[in-house]
């Protein structure tokens, strides 16, 4: 872009648009915003590009600018659900922000390293074990990711003692972790099985995220085996969650038939194996992305979404089953 003459407006605008897409995908929000501005200035941005720009403005807390952009998008794409949700979000966000939160968030240094830690889940009868994913140096494998520059993630665990102090996290032993990415684990209600996401790589053909299962023997987790949810090998299956009754596997996928790019689906465990997959549909899934499904023991269903009205980007939502046995969405 910087080496393209300003006189070549079309080419400069097209390159700005490609930069915006790359920055957006790599979560570099401010750089993506700047690149979208350039693409708009050179008049190469279509309404869908301006929708992406508006959603980034919302994510960045630029609510007034976001409102203007969402309104422009709706002039071209009347009724667009993501634009309508974004406009509602941008109008309500300042008041929600001013109200504050009843939760206090603080960093837990005992779990963190200089690398990435994510997807924590409590385990055990007393919830005194914390499993999470980390790309710290102790992870398996020698190769670094071409995307993150770090090692692939592994599952680590920390134990809380009688005094409430958490131990230094250790890599889960027993063959669970591999040289590939392991992350976002969950457990069966009886604690005997772990379900997690594994992302293998192969230079000869594309590989997609899969859900794998590990069985526990005493205190050790064994080598994981792949869960065959469908016969489609060109679809990603990730972020597993087991329903409190142990009958359903909830997961995230980009498979065809969804409402957005990423939806939450579920499949039932039967005596004959896995049943047919079901899309959760409304009010859970939107034209945006829904990810990271999680259950409380009482059945409350938590997930992340960037398609429902919120504060911008991925927000946390809760859904509860009503008397009609359907999910009802509550405020984030």
Predicted regions mapped to residue ranges:
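Short, conserved micro-motifs composed of acidic
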Residues: 25, 52, 59, 63-64, ...
């Amino acid at each position: 872009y910087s080496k393209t003459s300003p006189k070549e407006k079309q080419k400069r605008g097209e390159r700005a648009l490609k930069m915006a897409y790359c920055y957006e995908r790599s979560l570099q929000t401010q750089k993506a915003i700047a690149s979208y501005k350039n693409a708009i200035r050179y008049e190469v941005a279509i309404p869908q590009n301006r929708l992406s720009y508006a959603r980034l403005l919302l994510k960045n807390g630029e609510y007034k600018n976001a409102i203007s952009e969402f309104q422009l998008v709706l002039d071209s794409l009347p009724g667009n659900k993501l634009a309508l949700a974004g406009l509602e979000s941008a109008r309500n966000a300042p008041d929600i922000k001013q109200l504050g939160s009843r939760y206090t968030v603080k960093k837990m240094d005992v779990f963190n390293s200089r690398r990435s830690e994510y997807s924590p889940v409590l385990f055990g009868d007393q919830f005194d074990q914390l499993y999470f994913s980390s790309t710290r140096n102790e992870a398996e494998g020698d190769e670094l990711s071409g995307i993150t520059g770090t090692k692939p993630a592994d599952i680590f665990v920390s134990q809380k003692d009688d005094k409430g102090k958490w131990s230094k996290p250790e890599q889960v032993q027993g063959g669970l972790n591999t040289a590939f990415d392991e992350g976002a684990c969950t457990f069966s209600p009886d604690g005997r099985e772990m379900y997690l996401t594994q992302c293998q790589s192969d230079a000869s053909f594309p590989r997609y995220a899969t859900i794998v299962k590990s069985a526990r023997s005493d205190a050790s987790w064994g080598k994981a085996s792949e869960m065959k949810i469908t016969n489609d090998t060109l679809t990603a299956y990730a972020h597993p969650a087991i329903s409190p009754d142990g009958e359903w596997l909830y997961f995230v996928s980009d498979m065809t038939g969804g409402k957005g790019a990423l939806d939450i689906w579920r499949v039932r465990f039967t005596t004959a194996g896995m049943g047919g997959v079901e899309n959760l549909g409304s009010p859970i899934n939107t034209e945006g992305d829904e990810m990271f499904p999680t259950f409380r023991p009482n059945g409350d269903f938590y997930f992340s979404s960037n398609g429902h009205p919120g504060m911008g980007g991925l927000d946390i939502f809760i859904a509860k089953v009503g008397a009609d046995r359907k999910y009802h969405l509550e405020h984030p």
